[in-house]
Amino acid sequence: MANDKEIAQTESGSHPKDLKETLQEKKPSQPSLSLLCSAPPPAVPSEQASVGYGTVLARTPTIFLQARGALFSALPPPRAGHGTGGLGIKAGRRGAVARLHRGRTSDSPKAHHQ
C-alpha cells in the first residue's frame, strides 16, 4: 500500500519539491561551456554597420543624421563658410572685393608703391 501511494505521487508530478528541482535544472547558476560553444560569435561593429543592425546604426556619423542648420544641429547651414559669420560665402570676400575696386590687391605692384 505504501508503494502505491509513492507511485501515485511520482506519476502526478505535482509535488512542489519536484517543481523546484526542474526549475533549478533549467537555470544553471554558472554559465556552462556548452552554452558558450553553441552561441554564435558576436559580430564585429563594422559588420553590424554594413548590414545595418546592432549598436551601430550606419557608417554615417550621427552629426549627419539631422538636417544642416536645424535648431540643434551640430553642423552649420551649407551657406556658412569659414570666417563669414554665417552670412554666406561672399561675406568673407567683401574686404577683398573692396580692395579690388580701390585698385589695391595684394599681388599688385601698385599696392606696394602707393
Curated annotation (Swiss-Prot):
GO cellular component term, pick one: host cell nucleus
Sequence ranges of Basic and acidic residues compositional bias: 1-28, 104-114
Disulphide linkage map: none
Subunit and interaction comment: Assembles into oligomeric complexes. Interacts with host CDK1. Interacts with host SRPK1; this interaction may favor expression of late viral transcripts. Interacts with host cytokeratin components KRT8 and KRT18.
Domain of life of the source: Viruses
GO biological process, one term: symbiont-mediated arrest of host cell cycle during G2/M transition
UniProt keyword terms in alphabetical order: Early protein, Host cytoplasm, Host G2/M cell cycle arrest by virus, Host nucleus, Host-virus interaction, Modulation of host cell cycle by virus, Phosphoprotein
Organism expressing this protein natively: Bovine papillomavirus type 1
Misc remark: The major E4 form is first synthesized as an E1^E4 fusion protein from spliced E1^E4 transcripts, such that the first few amino acids of the E4 protein are derived from the N terminus of E1.
Function: Contributes to multiple aspects of the viral life cycle including viral genome amplification, suppression of suprabasal cell differentiation and egress of newly formed virions. Induces host cell cycle arrest at the G2 phase by associating with and preventing the nuclear entry of host CDK1/cyclin B1 complexes. Inhibits cellular DNA replication by preventing loading of host replication licensing proteins MCM2 and MCM7 onto chromatin. Within the cytoplasm, associates with host kinase SRPK1, a splicing factor regulator, and inhibits its activity.
The protein, known as: Protein E4
Keyword Lipid biosynthesis part of the UniProt annotation: no
Biased composition regions of type Low complexity, renumbered to the chain: 29-38
Annotated localization: Host cytoplasm; Host nucleus
Region ranges (Disordered): 1-48, 83-114
